[in-house]
């Protein structure tokens, strides 16, 4: 059997030093009774060491195990046997890995108690298409005892188990040097315990249309404004409407209804119907003469009347329609009076 296979078999036994077979090489070491070695890493063989060096190595391993709050079985026996041993070959202990990156066994996680002074907790959450991991200090209201005792622990009114995986929080610990940097990584919005971090590069805008009432302005009033140029590089300028001709058009609202603009004062808007413009006496005389000849007009007659009265063809057509309705009303009133 090879040297590595012998050490693996000795590491699997509970009492590897007493019942284990001796290595094939002459430079093999003697394991203490009750000692359990890790079989995942090959042992490191050293040369002739003094008893003082062996005791120092064992003390360093015990201190590392005590700092990580997880003692491997056989640590005390290894310390005692190494201090009194003077053999030529000494097994160097494997350096401890960071505790925050190791996942303890399920049995050890269930039985081992959490350290009382654990500075922060680690958790992960899904946001969008990615998975983010954060660390949260105990100052935001989340404690290990509350998580272990109550399955419905809440954070600011929201269930913790819905947003975080709290299965491994009891046995996990974080180095103390990561607390100041990690505590600021967690930020909650409205409804959580602490407000979000303010970003100075953005401006908090306040909504001005909070009442829910729609704006019914038909036109935009620019009275009192001077001509100005936009700061974004636009070359066009905006002037008051008083300086523009009558043919200029304005922005209109999307609300239905007949809305007209008062021409003398272009900057002041008003609602309602367009002001009625009465026809002149000459226009009415020409229209009445044509109506006396024929109550209905054709296309040629409409064009001729429009040219004579300086009215549009649509105005001529509407006037003839209204004139026929007026005759019907007069006839109906006469019938009512006679009857």
Swiss-Prot record:
| GO biological process, alphabetically ordered | anterior/posterior pattern specification; branch elongation of an epithelium; embryonic digit morphogenesis; embryonic hindgut morphogenesis; embryonic limb morphogenesis; gland morphogenesis; limb morphogenesis; male genitalia development
Subcellular localization is given as: Nucleus
| GO cellular component terms, semicolon-separated | nucleoplasm; nucleus
Instruction: State the residue spans of region: Disordered.
Output: 1-33
Q: Which residues form a coiled coil?
A: none
The record places the DNA-binding region at 272-331
Please give the Gene Ontology molecular function terms for this protein.
chromatin binding; cis-regulatory region sequence-specific DNA binding; DNA binding; DNA-binding transcription activator activity, RNA polymerase II-specific; DNA-binding transcription factor activity; RNA polymerase II cis-regulatory region sequence-specific DNA binding
Q: Name one Pfam family in it.
A: Homeodomain
| PROSITE patterns attached to this UniProt entry | HOMEOBOX_1 (PS00027), HOMEOBOX_2 (PS50071)
Instruction: Mark out the compositionally biased spans (Low complexity).
Output: 20-33
Listed A to Z, the keywords are: Developmental protein, DNA-binding, Homeobox, Nucleus, Transcription, Transcription regulation
Functional note: Sequence-specific transcription factor that binds gene promoters and activates their transcription. Part of a developmental regulatory system that provides cells with specific positional identities on the anterior-posterior axis.
The entry's family comment says:
Belongs to the Abd-B homeobox family.
Query: Could you identify this protein by its name?
Result: Homeobox protein Hox-D13
Which organism is this entry from? Answer: Mus musculus
């Amino acid at each position: 059997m090879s040297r590595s296979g012998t050490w693996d078999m000795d590491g699997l036994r509970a009492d590897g030093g007493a019942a284990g077979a001796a290595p094939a090489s002459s430079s093999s070491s003697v394991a203490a009774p009750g000692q359990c070695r890790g079989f995942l890493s090959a042992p490191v063989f050293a040369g002739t060491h003094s008893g003082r060096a062996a005791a120092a190595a064992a003390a360093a391993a015990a201190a590392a195990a005590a700092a990580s709050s997880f003692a491997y079985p056989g640590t005390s026996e290894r310390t005692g046997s190494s201090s009194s041993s003077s053999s030529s070959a000494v097994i160097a202990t494997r350096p401890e890995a960071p505790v925050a990156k190791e996942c303890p066994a399920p049995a050890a996680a269930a039985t081992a108690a959490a350290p009382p002074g654990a500075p922060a907790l680690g958790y992960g959450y899904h946001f969008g298409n990615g998975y983010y991991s954060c660390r949260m200090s105990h100052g935001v209201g989340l404690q290990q005892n509350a998580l272990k005792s109550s399955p419905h622990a809440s954070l600011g009114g929201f269930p913790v188990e819905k947003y975080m995986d709290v299965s491994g929080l009891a046995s996990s610990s974080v180095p103390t040097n990561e607390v100041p940097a990690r505590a600021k990584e967690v930020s909650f919005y409205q409804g959580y315990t602490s407000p979000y971090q303010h970003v100075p590069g953005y401006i908090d805008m306040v909504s001005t249309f909070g009442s829910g009432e729609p704006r019914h302005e038909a036109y935009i009033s620019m009275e009192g404004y001077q001509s100005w140029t936009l700061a974004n590089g636009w070359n066009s300028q905006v002037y008051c409407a008083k300086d523009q001709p009558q043919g200029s058009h304005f922005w209109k609202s999307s609300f239905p209804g007949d809305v007209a603009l008062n021409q003398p004062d272009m900057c002041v808007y008003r609602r309602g119907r367009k002001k009625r413009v009465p026809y002149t006496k000459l226009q009415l005389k020409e229209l009445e003469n044509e109506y006396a000849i024929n109550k209905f007009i054709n296309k040629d007659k409409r064009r001729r009347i429009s040219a004579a009265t300086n009215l549009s063809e649509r105005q001529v057509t509407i006037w003839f329609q209204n004139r026929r309705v007026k005759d019907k009303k007069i006839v109906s009133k006469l019938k009512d009076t006679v009857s």
